[in-house]
Amino acid sequence: MYKKFVFIFIAALMGACTSRQQADEKTLYVSILPLRSLVGEIVGDDFKIEVLVPPGASPETFEPTPRQFIGLNRAEMIFNVGLIDFETTLLSKIEERGKVVNLSQGIELIAGSCSHAHTPAKQAASGGDGTSCAEPHNHSHAHGVDPHVWTSPRALQKMAQNAYAAIRRAYPDSAKYETNYKRLQADLRALDARTGEKIAQSGIEYFIIYHPALTYYARDYGIRQVAIEADGKEPSAKRLTQVIRQAREDGVRRILYQEIIARDIDAEYVEVDPLREDAIANIDAITDIITRR
């Protein structure tokens, strides 16, 4: 009986210590996976970094759990893209608005979820009425702003700058974060340089993708994104015919995530995931896919 009592007491004490350690652990939140790698490169292991949208889930259908909402209010800081619908709705309910960091601040945004574009030499699969997805629009669109800034090496540099500025304000005495930030920026500049070099050497003018997730990437390097999907809607038969015909004429060799169309034009079907955690490695992989002959 005595041994049993001692065991229960020790177990309870250990449980209390674990709960206290969890409560004392400093936590940052990010809205999507690519932001965890970006912020993590700056803060290292000093914080636990929680991600709102789990791997494999869609930001478009995301609903936070009660546990996540409690965690957000307890978090030291919350980093978000600032352009995704659920972020606006959810983070407006946070009690301490000052700890919410909009990482897209200062980036020249592109209006709309553009579905098609012109190539420099010809109107690529647009039927003559396409809207460029690689150039900013000065007019408003009912479908808002393209949120995929994290797929752009140059936008990532600005996002890293915004993240570091917020971290420095909160923790001004940590020289380690400055060192980490400078190393991250060097990596992002190198990413930009090698991406631009690969695209220039490839001579490509445009690429075809199902969902327009690489709009900012295309703008960075002066190429065109021809997206099959229009504003989140399935493409019409006419649209598919236009894309297939133009792709055949131009000898397109691969389609990013649309198996049926790739089969119709005898091209390779390649799946890409813009929400992969390691943003730098993901952009390298996407560039290799786009430029590979």
State the predicted function of each range:
Residues 17-293:
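Extracytoplasmic metal-acquisition and chelation regions
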Residues 1-15:
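Sec-dependent bacterial lipoprotein signal peptides
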